[in-house]
């Protein structure tokens, strides 16, 4: 089995994380930068935009998310939501994934035949970037999971970190030192998911 496939297997959703340093913050920045540069995008659009939050900035994101959810989740059932936010906040940092809609709209105008496809391709490209960063972090011992509290938090995130209006929030990836093993991952039979014709 190739090294790359082995590295893919290391990536799991890790929810129990702490602020303790596994790799330096600078190393996290290097991983994210390399991933942003080298993850493919349709028409080489390079529409991905990423923000990395550490320390108090990371904490602030999950405080914002908690208070945003508090306003819409019934008080008598808010407990589990609050616990989940606390778990994400317990991590060392968060990667925020965006897609620049100005780039996408420019491609739609330039290649009108594919107009309806560009938003879909943009999401697919973002998914690849998320996977690359997630897998790279996992292989350096960093636990992470992928969250989607957009569009509920979009406006407040934009205001707090002065995010350009054209950047559409796609996903949030809290990360940190794993403090518990992920549960066993069940697999459906590969025969039901893969067909080969020769």
Give short role names for the model-derived ranges.
Residues 1-93, 197-198:
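N-terminal amphipathic, basic helical "cap/leader" segment at the start of enzyme domains
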Residues 99-103:
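Short glycine-enriched loops at secondary-structure junctions
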Residues 158-165, 182-186:
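Short proline/glycine-enriched turn/loop segments at secondary-structure junctions
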Residues 90, 95, 175-177:
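C-terminal edge-of-domain segments
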Residues 66-67, 109-117, 187:
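Short, surface-exposed, charged loop/turn segments at secondary-structure junctions
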């Amino acid at each position: 089995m190739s090294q790359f496939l082995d590295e893919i297997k290391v990536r799991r959703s890790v929810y129990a994380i702490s602020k303790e340093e596994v790799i330096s913050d600078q190393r996290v920045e290097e991983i994210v930068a390399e991933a942003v540069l080298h993850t493919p995008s349709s028409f080489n659009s390079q529409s991905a935009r990423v923000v990395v939050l550490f320390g108090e900035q990371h904490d602030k994101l999950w405080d914002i998310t908690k208070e945003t959810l508090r306003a819409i989740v019934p008080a008598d059932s808010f407990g589990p939501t609050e616990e989940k936010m606390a778990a994400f906040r317990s991590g060392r940092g968060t990667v925020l994934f965006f897609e620049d809609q100005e780039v996408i709209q420019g491609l739609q105008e330039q290649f009108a035949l594919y107009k309806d496809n560009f938003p879909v391709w943009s999401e697919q490209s973002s998914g690849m970037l998320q996977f690359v960063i997630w897998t790279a972090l996992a292989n350096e011992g960093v636990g992470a999971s992928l969250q989607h509290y957009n569009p509920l938090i979009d406006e407040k995130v934009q205001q707090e970190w002065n995010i350009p209006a054209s950047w559409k929030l796609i996903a949030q990836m809290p990360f940190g030192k794993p403090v518990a093993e992920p549960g066993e991952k069940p697999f459906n039979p590969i025969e039901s998911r893969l067909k080969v014709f020769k």
